[in-house]
């Protein structure tokens, strides 16, 4: 599923809607090894377009251009000079303990005026957590998750304002334990053999939330 390009867009890179996860329990013991497990960020989903000319365009889950709202993320383009890529990830605002702070992110997302955005870069800085790749010189959505993840890791895109968080292949219990200990809300299980399915919600991606006694 693709989204309509914004007015004036040249459409050099494919405009793809993000793949979506279902909410459910962890895969059973017989299927646990068929998935990798990633941190559940509860951030603002974005598709990052790197056309290879030093520019960057960030599209929200609904296809809105939100690039101007997050100027501190523009340095991502310098990490892939001359390369064309489309990346999937989430924008988060972290608290003093390095954990996602949803309220702080909502404050940041509400800002649109340049002066307000500039001021918020200090008080409400954001981080882009990258976890998938859709295009690298050519479409790669048909590749299995493991191959796409290898491509993403090889790009070494960690830098100011960007991270490529680790995945836990076939280690559901460890991933859930780590997530709970670090104060995250859960993990996302991603089937190792699954292609990237733009705009579709399937059990290839399963959002697994912690059941805490204080959250009923």
Where are the language model's segments positioned?
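Catalytic cores of nucleic-acid ligases and guanylyltransferases
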Residues: 1-216
């Amino acid at each position: 599923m693709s989204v309509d390009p914004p007015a004036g867009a040249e459409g050099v890179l494919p405009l793809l809607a993000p793949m979506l996860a279902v909410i459910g329990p962890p895969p059973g013991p017989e299927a646990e090894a068929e998935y990798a497990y990633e941190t559940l960020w509860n951030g603002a989903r974005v598709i990052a377009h790197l056309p290879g000319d030093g520019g960057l365009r960030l599209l929200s889950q609904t296809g809105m251009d939100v690039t101007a709202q997050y100027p501190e993320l523009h340095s991502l383009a310098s990490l892939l000079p001359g390369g064309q890529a489309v990346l999937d990830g989430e924008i988060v605002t972290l608290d003093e303990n390095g954990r996602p702070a949803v309220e702080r992110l909502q404050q940041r997302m509400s800002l649109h005026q340049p002066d307000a955005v500039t001021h918020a870069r200090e008080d409400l800085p954001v981080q882009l957590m990258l976890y998938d790749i859709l295009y690298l010189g050519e479409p790669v959505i048909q590749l299995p998750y493991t191959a796409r993840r290898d491509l993403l890791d090889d790009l070494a895109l960690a830098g100011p304002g960007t991270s490529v968080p680790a995945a836990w292949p076939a280690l559901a219990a460890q991933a859930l334990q780590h997530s709970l200990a670090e104060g995250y809300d859960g993990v996302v299980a991603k089937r190792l053999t699954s292609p990237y399915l733009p705009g579709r919600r399937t059990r290839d991606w399963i959002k697994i939330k912690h059941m805490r006694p204080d959250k009923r």
